[in-house]
């Protein structure tokens, strides 16, 4: 994993992270490297408290089909991504559910996600 962190930094690319039951180790690596590139937690399903801990450390959180509603509600717009990964759902279905959970219009959330993609993956 540390080699991937080095590559992310060397090439100026965000790091997409699949982490299961290793949050403390992940946070230790982040503290060790103090990366300049964005770290995106793929398929986040944790509790709001875990989300807040990660957000304070600068993570972006990406949500798929399964997540606690309260967690989705705690993530600020500028740190949010949506994904389908291995889901049978279309991204539009995930977008609609997330908008409902967050209490926003679908188009507003679509624009938020588009802006985040632009800022993280296509910044100059």
Placement of each model-derived feature along the sequence:
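Active-site metal-binding loops of divalent metal-dependent hydrolases
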Residues: 19, 43, 59, 65-67, ...
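Divalent metal-binding pocket/active-site signature
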Residues: 1-57, 103-104
């Amino acid at each position: 994993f540390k080699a991937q962190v080095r590559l992310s930094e060397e090439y100026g690319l965000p790091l997409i992270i699949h982490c299961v039951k290793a949050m403390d180790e992940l946070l230790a690596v982040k503290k060790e490297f103090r990366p300049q590139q964005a770290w995106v937690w793929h398929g986040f399903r944790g509790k709001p408290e875990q989300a807040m801990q990660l957000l304070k450390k600068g993570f972006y959180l990406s949500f798929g089909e399964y997540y606690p509603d309260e967690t989705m509600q705690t993530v600020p717009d500028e740190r949010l991504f949506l994904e389908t990964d291995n889901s049978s759902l279309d991204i539009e279905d995930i977008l609609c559910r997330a908008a409902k959970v967050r209490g926003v219009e679908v188009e507003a959330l679509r624009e938020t996600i588009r802006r985040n993609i632009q800022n993280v993956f296509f910044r100059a």
